């Protein structure tokens, strides 16, 4: 049974007890007078559900729902390519914020700000994007996947433009932080949801390719920002980013079209929170958010403090992003074979062990580079599986709401993660190993997230066995 058919049968379990469901492939709606034994040929690209129920008068009524199975290719691949570009230009710069942070703290606002304060800029960007995920999903459901993201692209571009004129740290909090974060929140939903509508058997591959846009973007934007800040100043770097984001994201969005899976999509209500798997999965997203951005924000500064050159620090950050891309590639290639839960568990194992066993025991360039690579591999694989796993566990109709909820809770984690790490770093500077507490603070939440996903897998096995 395919993933979509499993989702349909899962949805049928939520119908009233007096409703029996049967699912079979057909080309058109059948009339209610047609007998069950009619001989028809059904093409492979449509699936219909026949619902039989008894009303109060004891009369039998048939209701029919037609499901258009995803084509698993065709125009869907163009949707994947454009979604990749949307992720690259809208979310890629978030992974590259460490370069801006180092410049703001050590040059532009030197002596007038701290790591903890400036890290709030990147945190507000990432957390606003994520926390507003549910709102973005609901808005896209109501107004479509064209109008809402276009508003987001305009806000995102405007945020970078206004940030270029910032003369105080709090100006950056409002522009590069909040405004860019809100813009990204409204922009990224089509890239996460729409490709999954076009694929069933290859859904893991398709969504994985899309999510690689962040990893590729992190690599390119890190080097791009580092080079341009030195050549044309941070202000003109931000202005150029504003123009590039506006043009590239708009062109990509114009080619992203939705594929309606059902004639009447199932509405997802808050009663879904009664599902233990959903609660555990969302808890995992929160703790992932707490940990995941800290290394990207603090690796350049950490490298400088242990004697690595400025260029070496940027290289470590770039290699971490390159490893993130590799992790996304590997996870994407094997996702449909091993399944998203197994891939997610492997990703959490890599991130946890890299922080607690590698980063905590190294104090040189080579060891830090090794940590960045191993952590990047695990981190990259983590976020490739979100859409595929939600579709597998809860159905395609749940994607807008549950993907939004996932990123909302991850955003709350983002909001706490790097700023608290900055405070910890400031308080432990007098220690013999000032970064040790920060490393432990980064590693423990990732272990908790790993445990949550293990429990999701066990709960899924128990549910299937029941």
Show which residues each predicted segment covers.
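C-terminal transmembrane helical hairpin of 12-TM major facilitator-type secondary transporters
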Residues: 306-308, 312, 318-324, 329-393, ...
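C-terminal ends and interior cores of transmembrane alpha-helices
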Residues: 154-167, 253, 349-363
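Helix-to-loop junctions at the C-terminal end of transmembrane segments
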Residues: 131-145, 229, 327-340, 358, ...
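Hydrophobic core of transmembrane alpha-helices in multi-pass small-molecule transporters
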Residues: 82-84, 88-89, 156-160, 169-190, ...
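Intrinsically disordered, low-complexity terminal tails of fungal membrane proteins
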Residues: 1-73, 458-466
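Conserved MFS/SLC helix-loop-helix module at the cytosolic interface between two early adjacent transmembrane helices
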Residues: 131-171, 335
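Extracytoplasmic gate region of multi-pass secondary transporters
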Residues: 89-104, 222, 275-342, 387, ...
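Intracellular juxtamembrane helix-capping segments at the cytosolic ends
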Residues: 104, 177, 184-199, 206-207, ...
């Amino acid at each position: 049974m395919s993933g979509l058919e499993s989702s349909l049968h899962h949805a049928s379990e939520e119908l009233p007890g007096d409703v029996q469901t049967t699912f079979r492939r057909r080309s058109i709606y059948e009339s209610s007078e047609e007998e069950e034994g009619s001989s028809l040929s059904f093409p492979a690209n449509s699936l219909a559900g026949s619902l039989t129920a008894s009303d109060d008068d004891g009369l039998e009524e048939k209701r029919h729902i037609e499901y258009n199975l995803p084509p698993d290719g065709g125009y869907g691949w163009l949707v994947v390519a454009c979604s990749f570009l949307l992720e690259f230009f809208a979310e890629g710069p978030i992974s590259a914020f460490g370069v801006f942070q180092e410049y703001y703290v050590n040059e532009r606002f030197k002596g007038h700000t701290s790591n903890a304060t400036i890290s709030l800029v990147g945190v507000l960007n990432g957390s606003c994007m994520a926390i507003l995920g549910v709102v973005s999903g609901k808005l896209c459901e109501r107004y479509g996947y064209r109008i809402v993201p276009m508003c987001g692209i305009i806000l995102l571009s405007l945020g970078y433009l206004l940030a270029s004129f910032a003369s105080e740290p709090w100006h950056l909090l409002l522009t590069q932080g909040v405004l860019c974060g809100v813009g990204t929140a409204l922009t990224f939903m089509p890239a996460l949801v729409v490709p999954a509508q076009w694929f069933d058997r290859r859904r893991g591959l398709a969504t994985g390719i899309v999510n690689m846009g962040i990893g590729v973007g992190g690599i390119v934007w890190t080097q791009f920002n580092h080079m341009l800040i030195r050549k044309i100043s941070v202000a003109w770097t931000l202005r150029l980013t504003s123009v590039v984001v506006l043009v590239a994201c708009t062109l990509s969005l114009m080619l992203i079209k939705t594929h309606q899976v059902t004639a009447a999509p199932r509405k997802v209500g808050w009663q879904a929170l009664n599902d233990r798997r959903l609660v555990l999965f969302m808890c995992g997203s929160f703790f992932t958010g707490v940990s995941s951005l800290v290394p990207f924000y603090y690796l350049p500064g950490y490298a400088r403090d242990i004697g690595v050159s400025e260029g070496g620090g940027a290289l470590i950050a770039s290699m971490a992003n390159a490893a993130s891309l590799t992790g996304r590639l590997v996870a994407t290639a094997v996702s449909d074979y091993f399944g998203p839960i197994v891939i997610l568990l492997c990703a959490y194992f890599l991130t946890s062990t890299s922080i607690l066993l590698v980063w905590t025991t190294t104090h040189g360039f080579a060891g830090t580079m090794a940590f960045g690579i191993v952590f990047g591999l695990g981190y990259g694989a983590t976020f490739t599986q979100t859409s595929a796993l939600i579709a597998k566990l809860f159905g395609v109709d749940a994607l807008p709401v549950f993907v939004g909820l996932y990123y909302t809770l991850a955003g709350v984690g983002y909001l706490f993660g790097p700023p608290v790490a900055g405070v910890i770093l400031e308080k432990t500077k007098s220690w013999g190993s000032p970064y040790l507490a920060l490393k432990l603070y980064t590693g423990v939440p990732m272990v908790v997230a790993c445990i949550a996903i293990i429990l999701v897998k066990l709960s899924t096995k128990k549910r299937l066995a029941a």
